Amino acid sequence: MRTILPGGEPFFFLGNSGIGCLLLHGLTSAPQEMRGLGEYLAARGHTVLGLRLPAHATRPRAMLHTHWEDWLAAAEDGYHLLENNVRQVIVLGLSLGGAIGLLLASSRPVVGVVAMSTPYEVPPQPRLRFLKALLQPLALLGRVIPFLPKPPPMDYRDREAARNHLTYPVMPVRAITETARLLAVMRARLAEVRVPVLLMHSIHDGGVSPANARSIYEQLGSAQKQLLWLENSGHVLTVEPAHRQVYESAAGFVERWSQPAREGLGEPDEGAATRPRRRASLGR
């Protein structure tokens, strides 16, 4: 009997650069959405570990018994596995994975973090902020109605990518409340993140408002932080038409801030990421 969905398997690529890249996927999704980025980094000689977060890529019911600490513990396991085989570790995460990466960086000596489409709070859309007051009742409701229907994704620029994206067809209520708890801890620790951080976010993200990226950027304790806005993409940056720009920017960041890369690969292209800029549409 197969328990992990096809495409939900973790992946590992052994490199020779001395750099380890820990890749973390998003909520109710799977390692599949990070694999292309992982293969790109591996082709540049880096060791890559793409984790499957607990209760993901199996069945939605597995989420009903999972806590946010389980997700963080899995990322910590991945960090320790890598650090035993490389000289430096960088975390790259999408959505929930980005939040976990930032949280990990507040307590572990990672070299840097690439956080893509990362939420600052739940709900991650300003127009839904009135729902914050419902989080506690929602946790109680989850005992009676464990799943909520997911609306069809509307922000994809690549419809084939939308069809092929491996994710649960429903949203476990428990996953929402646990994500809210994780993000509360992340917000409290952002000032403790002192390593370089690259934030990437689409200005068309329909799942996590771009305002989330601005809030994270402003509260990070790091002196080396960048915010790259993407045009031709929706929420899942790694599979959209802009994915090549995402891959190149991530690799440039990895190779800029890791000493083994500077020794062996030379200086990266300074144009790999842009300085943060204000957009009138972001708001707070």
Please report, for each region that a protein language model flagged, where it lies by residue.
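Short beta-strand/loop motif that positions the catalytic acidic residue
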Residues: 193, 199-201, 205
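Catalytic histidine neighborhood in serine/cysteine hydrolases
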Residues: 214, 218-236
